[in-house]
């Protein structure tokens, strides 16, 4: 059996050399714990005696137990390659797949960034499941590894990161500047989806309202502009969809940790556009990144929605240890032309990576996320994780 395996490996080596195929990936997992804290403030009427009824405030607080589990932190495996076609032209391809060392996970190949394309002096043209410009920019602002992409990563801030089935063009670099454009056809955009839920009637009986699947949104357009000069780097990312299936409900779903395509499409909007500006500086062991994001949309009744957010990450290498901290803040949002009072959120993630070697590291982090949901109301998530990461 060993002889057969050896022969198979040796016979594959010349093929790999000719085709220029690379195998790469990351295996990362660990132990995570989290709990939720809620506060609900309600105004109620009470009997005030001779003065009649008066309003009193009822404050309800709830706290979940700490839930601990062994989780995969986003392991994946990938293959990529290229072929020289002559005259400076190359064929390029990549196939990436999520894997899980904690069991379960994806059931189909190519569920991460996977594409085929051409590269040359004109730039690079790719078609397939290609990361958008927001996903590119997030590599600097959110380097955290975790199974909890809402609290232990900047999941709310990164809700527009995606790898849609699309075609993307990246230009060559000119004096430090480069750009890109990306097109997602309507057939590949996400469908509007309202999940099933229960409602109470006057007799307090629960009635199930079934899920509703709507039509896809519209074509989606992305664009990006990059600049790099020494240790300084900047990125601008833009998204536009005339009819979009992301909105207020999707924002809430991201808060509770849902990451499926269906969960992202629950509130059809018009003229949805997102702008994100990211800047970074790297010198020696110091890494700094700042980002600001503006999310704009319209409703069917012509009223407007908007959210404004900022995020920052800083790290510094001390020998084998890299301590890091991130902060994100979302200002009170505007919904249907009206400002939502006390609807902001704050998030802090702190941790350290310790490198045993160039490819293997221990990763430790703690996270705190508080989302205000009205005057006197909030949802808070506390999380911590410790794990191991190996790159190959």
Curated annotation (Swiss-Prot):
InterPro entries: Gram-neg_bact_OMP, Gram_neg_porin_domain, Porin_dom_sf, Porin_Gram-ve, Porin_Gram-ve_CS, Porin_Neis. Residues 1-19 form the signal peptide. GO terms for cellular component: cell outer membrane; pore complex. One of its GO terms (biological process) is monoatomic ion transmembrane transport. It is a multi-pass membrane protein. It is found in: Cell outer membrane. One of its GO terms (molecular function) is porin activity. Its main location: membrane. The keyword Acetylation does not apply. Coiled coil: none annotated. Keywords: Cell outer membrane, Ion transport, Membrane, Porin, Signal, Transmembrane, Transmembrane beta strand, Transport. Serves as a slightly cation selective porin. Major antigen on the gonococcal cell surface and it may have pathogenic properties in addition to its porin activity. Homotrimer. Belongs to the Gram-negative porin family. Present in outer membrane vesicle formulations which are used as vaccines in human. This is Major outer membrane protein P.IA. The lineage of its organism: Bacteria, Pseudomonadati, Pseudomonadota, Betaproteobacteria, Neisseriales. The gene is porA.
